[in-house]
Amino acid sequence: MSRIEATFRALEDQGRKALIPYVTAGFPFADITPALMHGMVEAGADIIELGVPFSDPMADGPVIQRAGEKALGLGIGMSQVFHQVREFRKRNGTTPVVLMGYANPVERYEQIHGQGAQQGAQGAQEAFVRDAAAAGVDGVLVVDYPPEECTAFAASLRARGMDLIFLLAPTSTAERMAQVAQVASGYVYYVSLKGVTGSGALDRSAVEQMLPRIRQHVRIPVGVGFGIRDAATAQAIGKVADAVIIGSRIIELIEDQEHAKVVPVTIDFLRGIRKALDA
């Protein structure tokens, strides 16, 4: 059983829902990520999604795009992300960490450190998987990897105790859901809005209608993200989903903070979300 699976099982036994905050690695300061991750756990986070900066993030809205651009400017790449996870693991060996990003940084890392050029785009990615596992990563979400081409990658991750997570959207067909169900593990991330991260207001009724359709195909937990900006919305989504995922709002709150305030501001916000989820 992976750490992510164990986390969801424990939460289910407690009658609680998972709080999954997202932050871009190396944002807003290159050295702050491990401390920020610890702050998230202190505030009640159950799983942490750590964004891998990329220069062409097609699914991200302007807020997370800015975060990625700043992190790239600070020299944050995949090797630095692994280092940040290792630093976090020195004090926390239990909270699952999921890397969320795009194919290009994964493949670039593989070409430098492994045999990626020979394996093909969605190969087993052995060097990436090896080093992710060694760093203490628990799951990977690659936005632009199609599930039908990820059998080897998923098997490689699972062999090292990691999960491969996929997105589903309001436009996802039954066929797509079935394809995702074949290879996904850990949880599925349901994108509650059409468009990019941080866009629009979440429609709870639409989410309520979609989740039973997803669960006809997917037997693992379903987390909902995109458009969750406050405790009331998080509480409403927590009543129907297995996890609440919050990213853009956290980035907005910390992007202009001075170094000393980044962690306290994040803790304060997430404590409010946690309290609402547990109410």
UniProtKB/Swiss-Prot annotation:
One of its GO terms (molecular function) is tryptophan synthase activity. The active site is at E49, D60. PROSITE patterns: TRP_SYNTHASE_ALPHA. Its EC number is 4.2.1.20. Pathway: Amino-acid biosynthesis; L-tryptophan biosynthesis; L-tryptophan from chorismate: step 5/5. It holds the Pfam family Trp_syntA. InterPro entries: Aldolase_TIM (IPR013785), RibuloseP-bd_barrel (IPR011060), Trp_synthase_alpha_AS (IPR018204), Trp_synthase_suA (IPR002028). One of its GO terms (cellular component) is cytosol. It is an enzyme of class 4 (lyase). It catalyses: (1S,2R)-1-C-(indol-3-yl)glycerol 3-phosphate + L-serine = D-glyceraldehyde 3-phosphate + L-tryptophan + H2O. Keywords: Amino-acid biosynthesis, Aromatic amino acid biosynthesis, Lyase, Tryptophan biosynthesis. The alpha subunit is responsible for the aldol cleavage of indoleglycerol phosphate to indole and glyceraldehyde 3-phosphate. Belongs to the TrpA family. Tetramer of two alpha and two beta chains. This is Tryptophan synthase alpha chain. It comes from Verminephrobacter eiseniae (strain EF01-2). The gene is trpA.
